[in-house]
Each structure stands twice: as structure tokens, then as C-alpha cells.
């Protein structure tokens, strides 16, 4: 068995090392990730700049590859340049901070990497862990965080995938781990509305010209059964099954056009 591991926090992030350590005795592992922090880049691919693959080592001295591009670029290189053959599973993470809700789904580089692998028929898992101080993710993910529980839960899922694959019609799993989980079970949850309510901060530079920061406050209005509610209200680890087919109900549009 072979696994490709990537992320959007960067190849030196604590979470990607934790993911590797969690499963490396189950399969052959190849780590290919962006060289720098790529949070919020979504499923973007680099088309207008040359890219480099730089061999590197993780903090445990194991081999990895840093790509001067996006998470999708890293997965593309992993699949078609570095590994040489299709892996049995692709793991994106362990991400620093949640990836929940419909609105943020396509902006997440963590999920973007998993989507890219899933588009080639590879069972994929995007896994993220809550951190109280969400801003630390912008420190290139290198802050020491205890990902041991998330690693344990990831290992459990990888074993199931190796045994059964993913169910028909499911292309990838979006997995989120609370900082203080109540148990070692998963709650299967649907996507909530969003992760943040956007906030735009307007400031002035020394010459009086405006510039802006986009931020947000946590969204806390998700109803029961959603990923946000299960994670934030119940402290339960969640799995949300996803499909790359975004096609809506075609018959409704045919009727609508009449």
C-alpha cells in the first residue's frame, strides 16, 4: 500500500509530520507539500509561473518534497512526477484549524488538495484539527501542537479505507477533530452554512490611501446535525462525505427553462 500526504500549511508544518507518523507503519508514505503557507488558496493551480520541486527533510529527518506552488500543484507533482504510480490513498493535513461549512469548502487548500487526488479516483481524506488560537496557522504551521488524537483517528480511517475503500458515490472525506474531544467516535455530519462571518477592515497607509484586510468572526448558528454544531457544541469528531460531482438537479432546470 502507498499513501501520498500533502497539506496547505506547508511542508514544515507540525500537522503533516503527525499525519505521516500516524500511518507510516501501515504503508509506504510519500510527503509532497507546498513550501510555504497556502491557507485559503482552495483548488488553485499555478499556470503562469515556473515551479520547482525541492527535496527536503521533515523534523524527524525523513524525506519529503517542497513544491513552490499550491496544494493542488503539490498533489499533481506527487502523482505524476514523484511517485510514479497511483497511491492507494491520499491524505491532506493534519490542518491547523477547522475546515467546516459550505461557504469555506472551496476556499480550503486542505480540501483542494484532497479534491485534486479524488478527481483521479484516489480515495482521499482531508483532516483538520481545531486550535483555540487560530492565528497560529499563519506562522507556517510550525508551532508545536498536539496532533496525537487526530493522528489516532486518522489511522483508524486509513485502516478502514485499506480494507474497504470508500463507499460508492463518495470521493473524499472531510474530517474535523475538536481540540477537546469527548470520545473516540466519529459523528457523521452534514455541512453547516459557513465557518466565519466575513469582516473587512479598512485602514490607511502613511500616504492616506486605503488598504484592506479580510477576516472574520466564528459563525455559531449551525443547526443540529451539522459539522459546526457537532464540533463546537458537542466536542465530537466529525466526518462529512463529499463528492466531486457538483451537478445540481438537472430536471429542475429543464422545468425552470420552460
From Swiss-Prot:
The keyword Hydrolase applies. It is found in: Cytoplasm. One of its GO terms (cellular component) is cytoplasm. A divalent metal cation binds at residues 8-9, 39, 95. Its cofactor is a divalent metal cation. This is 5'-nucleotidase SurE. The gene is surE. It is an enzyme of class 3 (hydrolase). SUPFAM superfamilies: SurE-like. Its EC number is 3.1.3.5. Nucleotidase that shows phosphatase activity on nucleoside 5'-monophosphates. GO terms for molecular function: 5'-nucleotidase activity; metal ion binding; nucleotide binding. It comes from the Archaea. It catalyses: a ribonucleoside 5'-phosphate + H2O = a ribonucleoside + phosphate. Binds 1 divalent metal cation per subunit. Belongs to the SurE nucleotidase family. HAMAP family: SurE. Keywords: Cytoplasm, Hydrolase, Metal-binding, Nucleotide-binding.
Amino acid at each position: 500500500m502507498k499513501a501520498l500526504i500533502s497539506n496547505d500549511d506547508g511542508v514544515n508544518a507540525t500537522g503533516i509530520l503527525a499525519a505521516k507518523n500516524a500511518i507510516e507503519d501501515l504503508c509506504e508514505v510519500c510527503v509532497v507539500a507546498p513550501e510555504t503557507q497556502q491557507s485559503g488558496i482552495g483548488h488553485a493551480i499555478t499556470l503562469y509561473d515556473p515551479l520547482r520541486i525541492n527535496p527536503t527533510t521533515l523534523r524527524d529527518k525523513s524525506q519529503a518534497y517542497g513544491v513552490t506552488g499550491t496544494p493542488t500543484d503539490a498533489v499533481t507533482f506527487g502523482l505524476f512526477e514523484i511517485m510514479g504510480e497511483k497511491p492507494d490513498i491520499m491524505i491532506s493535513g493534519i490542518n491547523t484549524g477547522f475546515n467546516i461549512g459550505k461557504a469555506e469548502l472551496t476556499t480550503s487548500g486542505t480540501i483542494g488538495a484532497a479534491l485534486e487526488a479524488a478527481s483521479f479516483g484516489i480515495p482521499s481524506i482531508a483532516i483538520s484539527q481545531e486550535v483555540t488560537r487560530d492565528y497560529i496557522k499563519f506562522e507556517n504551521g510550525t508551532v508545536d501542537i498536539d496532533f496525537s488524537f487526530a493522528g489516532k483517528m486518522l489511522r483508524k480511517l486509513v485502516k478502514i479505507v485499506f480494507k474497504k475503500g470508500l463507499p460508492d458515490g463518495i470521493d473524499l472525506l472531510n474530517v474535523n477533530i475538536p481540540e477537546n474531544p469527548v470520545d473516540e467516535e466519529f459523528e457523521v455530519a452534514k455541512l453547516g452554512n459557513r465557518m466565519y462571518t466575513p469582516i473587512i477592515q479598512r485602514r490607511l497607509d502613511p500616504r492616506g490611501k486605503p488598504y484592506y484586510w479580510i477576516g472574520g468572526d466564528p459563525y455559531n448558528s449551525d443547526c443540529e446535525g451539522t459539522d459546526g454544531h457537532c464540533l463546537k457544541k458537542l466536542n465530537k469528531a466529525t466526518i462529512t462525505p463529499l463528492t466531486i460531482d457538483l451537478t445540481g438537479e438537472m430536471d429542475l432546470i429543464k422545468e425552470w427553462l420552460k
